[in-house]
Amino acid sequence: MTMQGKIPRPRGNVPRAIHLPLTRRSLIGAGLAIVGGGLGLASRRADAASGRLLFAGVNLAGGEFGEMPGTQGKDYRYPATADIDYYAELGFNLIRVPFRWERLQPTLGTPFVPADQGQLTKVVEYAAGKGLHVVLDTHNYARRRLADDGWTQDHLIGSKLVPTAAFADYCGRLAGIFKGAQSVMFGLMNEPWGMESEDWLVIANAAIAALRREGAQQMALVPGVAYSGAHSWVSARNIVMGNIVDPANKFAFEVHQYFDADSSGTSPIAVGASIGSERIEIFQRWCRQNGFRAFLGEFAAGADATSLAALDDICRTLEANSDVWLGWAAWAGGTWWPDDYIFTLEPSKGKKMRPQTRILATYARHRASRPN
């Protein structure tokens, strides 16, 4: 997901209540004990050999919405139990939960806000009880805002005001809370942009080191720069991310891929029925050649025939290449989307299932595994 206005923006037409920063095109308690499936190398290899993806999920947007810092329930919200129930009942086994670093930790280097930490904890616990894994998605684009300048300026991670050590501290605190939750995966950062891949590599390695120092052994999902586009992985020089250092050796590369003309996800119109599969191919080949695993953290389609065909096609491609892909999370669920949002997966006002959701649910029911 890209950014616009004053905070991370939803793709396409934006709900009025959501004010977001910088479009892609304008600047272009304590450890949880949760029963869940582990993500060991042996199990990943077994599923790859069987031609089965581990994860089929959806993004549940809302925690990244609104003015900064915002008020929970007014400017932003975390997934409710009913949101999780809807997708669990359709057969999905994963949710990706976007939220803002600033809301968990308004002041760098300090303990998390109990209310926001508590809400995320409830989401993880409830989802695990429903058999769903949770990707914790720090939805900040490799930058954050500070109270000192009235929450108006975006400061890159690695800058003087937001040093890499501050991000590592944040990641370590997140790990300390959720290291006992085996259903959790740590999405290091949503769609980094505005920096060189070499600089992002240093930051990502510091984040992973912080996770592992705190004892978190779950999967880390590592994005690249240039919004972590699969289509631009090589051209953006994200191949340098092959130098990731993970003492636990439990990481995968997270990429995003949209089907519109410029891969921005700002139009619902797919440019071809196989465009998604075509665009991920070069990244997929790089992963296979280098022995890496991957996760498609965002993709979406409109409701026209070509776009729906492209959605079905990419799901089939991911499944056919399960030696590379761990799984996927489609964009986007979340009950704060307006009924006419171009990529909503929520039921229509008439309670009718969206055609996109129907396609995704078919793959989720037939292909995805559940936590042990």
Go through each PLM region and give its residues.
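N-terminal secretory signal peptides and thylakoid transit peptides that target proteins
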Residues: 6-35
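C-terminal segment of N-terminal export signals and the immediately downstream linker at the start
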Residues: 20-21, 41-54
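Hydrophobic h-region of N-terminal signal peptides that target proteins for export
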Residues: 36-40
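Active-site mouth of glycoside hydrolases
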Residues: 51-236
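Extracellular glycoside hydrolase catalytic/binding regions
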Residues: 76, 169, 176, 180-185, ...
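Extended, alpha-helix-rich binding/interface surfaces that flank or overlap catalytic cores
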Residues: 316-317, 321-372
